[in-house]
């Protein structure tokens, strides 16, 4: 009985790690800005992200509000 309970707990733990998203949640504080433009032809302003990791993290966590990299540097 103990082995069965232990096995179930291990499987649940593995499933939790597999189901976890792979979004970067912690980015460095290096300020190497990138300008992003809304994906999919949305009509909203370009947005400056602190770095590429910030843009990637935003896109991963906000599937309906993604940005494509327009260029390095701040948006004008």
Swiss-Prot record:
MF terms in GO: calcium channel regulator activity; toxin activity
SUPFAM superfamilies (alphabetical): Kazal-type serine protease inhibitors
Gene Ontology BP term (one): vasodilation
Start and end residues of each Kazal-like domain: 22-76
UniProt entry tagged with the keyword Disulfide bond: yes
Intrachain disulfide bonds: 23-60, 27-53, 35-75
Tissue-level expression: Expressed by the salivary gland.
Entry-linked Pfam families: Kazal_1 (PF00050)
Keywords attached to this entry: Calcium channel impairing toxin, Disulfide bond, Ion channel impairing toxin, Secreted, Signal, Toxin, Vasoactive, Vasodilator, Voltage-gated calcium channel impairing toxin
Subcellular location: Secreted
Function statement: Vasodilator protein that inhibits vasoconstriction of isolated rat femoral artery induced by phenylephrine. Since platelet aggregation and vasoconstriction are key hemostatic responses, particularly in small wounds, this protein likely participates in the antihemostatic responses during blood feeding. Blocks L-type calcium channels (Cav1/CACNA1) in left ventricular myocytes isolated from rat hearts.
Protein name: Vasotab-TY3
Species for this entry: Tabanus yao
